[in-house]
Amino acid sequence: MVRGAFGRLGRLVRHRLFQVLVSLAIGAALLWLAIARIDLAGLGAELAQVKPSWLVAAVALYWVALMLRSWRWRILLAPVRALSFGQVFHGLLVGYAANYLLPARLGELVRADLLGRRYAISRLSIVGTIVVERLFDVVVFIGFIFAGLAALHSTGDSRIGPILHLVELVAIGCVVLIVLLLVLIRLRHKPLPRPIAFLEKRLRALAAGLHLITGAQEVALLIAATAIVWTADTVTYWLLAYSLNAPLTLLQLFLVMGMSCLAALIPAAPGNIGALQYALVLAFQLLGLPGVTGFSLATLAQGCCIAGSTLVGGGLYLLAALGNARTRPKLAEPPVP
């Protein structure tokens, strides 16, 4: 039995190590491709001209956007369990830190597990709220890409085709997911066929997290919350670009946001290093702007915004882990003879 447990642990470690190595390789390859597309000598000069006041404003708004995301997630969690803003914000920061540090966006499961353990909530119900949250985000991402492509002077660029094909695949996946969620909601109070009856409890727990997409009023509330969240995110990127003396028009900004979202779908290195650089270099070059500015924008976003929230989220997780270790009951010591 012990040997079997160690065998399973070994396979899990190897699997996780393989995921990390693959993500690092993808990030390194994309970073190399991004560097190959720009004048690397001009990168230092580009970053040296950053306007500090605009950069500070961008970082401040980035944290406001994170708070707004916590507010939206709290709305989604309300039918499952009423939590304070601080409790939700803590979970979101830890989850986002894990997303930036771990491959395959495992941070979504980390925040579900954290809130589930801490507040005795079904993890599947929390996962259901995260699925809804990300579904609304994907719809925004698709809108960004299609609106942003309208900013291009030439639609005959051969680089546009692969982007559109990828967005189409994401859109198809989004539609399939919506259909599956609607089916799950309809079946949540009905007994399942005997072969899959063992899943009934789990599926109902998952469906509990989908409660807010069952009514028009609730969907309208989520649309409004998502619009506010993404407005803050979009203005953050505009401020970062402006700090680099690169004021973007609205349609140009939409393409940049869409490409940054596309980069987030790639299981690349921690902090999305490489993927974000390549995506924004490509976006700026499609817009007829210097690719080095896109590279600088990605680097600023990672170094000044993402790194800060990752450090805070990681610190909160470590503090919680240390607190749990201290409060864990100790085993009784045997009496001294």
What kind of feature is each model-predicted range?
Residues L106-G116, A147, P270-L286:
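Re-entrant/interfacial helical elements at transmembrane boundaries that shape
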Residues L109-L114, V127-I130, V140, A225, ...:
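Hydrophobic alpha-helical membrane segments of integral membrane proteins
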Residues N245-L251, I273, A279-T299:
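Extracellular/periplasmic helix-loop-helix junctions in multi-pass membrane proteins
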Residues G86-H90, E108-V110, I121-R134, L289-L300:
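Membrane-interface alpha-helices at helix entry/exit sites of multi-pass transporters
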